[in-house]
Amino acid sequence: MSENIPLRVQFKRMKAAEWARSDVILLESEIGFETDTGFARAGDGHNRFSDLGYISPLDYNLLTNKPNIDGLATKVETAQKLQQKADKETVYTKAESKQELDKKLNLKGGVMTGQLKFKPAATVAYSSSTGGAVNIDLSSTRGAGVVVYSDNDTSDGPLMSLRTGKETFNQSALFVDYKGTTNAVNIAMRHATTPNFSSALNITSGNENGSAMQLRGSEKALGTLKITHENPSIGADYDKNAARYPLILSKRQNGAGTAAQGIYINSTSGTTGKLLRIRNLSDDKFYVKSDGGFYAKETSQIDGNLKLKDPTANDHAATKAYVDKAISELKKLILKK
């Protein structure tokens, strides 16, 4: 005659931090509880508590003949409960549970084949400090907020992708609100072992009624846009074909041509500064003053190498007013003699 021997389940209780330091190996009939989080792990007779996977309500029911499981990781919900991944790591599906996760939710083990998706309600705040479907407050730490890293040789997608599919969308894809002591945005493209034709920043716009990039600065003694070219080699002539500011005007593919202007300089309110200034070794070589005059030095106006077809034309850089003034000064000198 066979005899049914009921399974006896032993419980051990410690705080999560104590379990992490513990070398206790739970037997197959033992369950360890984290008293401060409510998590539970079932022993296997071989591994430490921290090496075991958390048990789900289903596992717990089978082990304990379905007792009240309200004391587990989160309160039992009618339609949404703890789900169990294949690697035995718990995944929460109900944010309203507000479960304290001891500063970290560790999703590890196995191969992740799914996605972690958020579909917020319409009431999510848009504040740049307290809003967002995902909000990370780093006020109490000096670490990075989000780190996306890959060690793959190739990839089918970017490390981060931002997209909107609606033409009526009226907000930026990326917004940076910064008040600090370093650069608001840093892009560092490392030197490749084999140089390739790629850029640290590539901006392409198909909007013909807007600029591809707009810059607005309020500098006292610096340029709104500063471009520095550095020779990648110690050889003086290595970069002889490089340019700090190349400007290319191109026609559309299969188009007839282009009539775009190369460099357009304008001051809508008027400026008394030089409109164009070219230097080498910190010495002025050529500049155009606010009145349109061409100069090589402060007092040496260009004459020999600049040929004017119509020096008295009103629409020429050497304006009629300028020529008239120069002739007047010349007449004064002649009369003195």
Curated annotation (Swiss-Prot):
Q: Which organism is it from?
A: Streptococcus pyogenes phage H10403
Say which domain of life the source belongs to.
Answer: Viruses
> In the record, which residues are listed under signal peptide?
none
Could you tell me what reaction this enzyme catalyses?
Random hydrolysis of (1->4)-linkages between N-acetyl-beta-D-glucosamine and D-glucuronate residues in hyaluronate
**InterPro entries (alphabetical):** Hyaluronidase_bac, Mtd_N
The record's GO CC annotations read: virion component
* Pfam families per record: Hyaluronidase_1, Mtd_N
Would you kindly state one Gene Ontology biological process term found in this protein's UniProt entry?
A: capsule polysaccharide biosynthetic process
Broad class of where this protein is predominantly found:
virion
Q: Where in the cell is it found?
A: Virion
Homology family: Belongs to the glycosyl hydrolase 69 family.
Q: What is this protein called?
A: Hyaluronoglucosaminidase
GO function terms (MF aspect): hyalurononglucosaminidase activity
What EC number(s) are associated with this protein in UniProt? 3.2.1.35
Q: Which UniProt keyword terms apply here?
A: Degradation of host capsule during virus entry, Degradation of host cell envelope components during virus entry, Glycosidase, Hydrolase, Virion, Virus entry into host cell
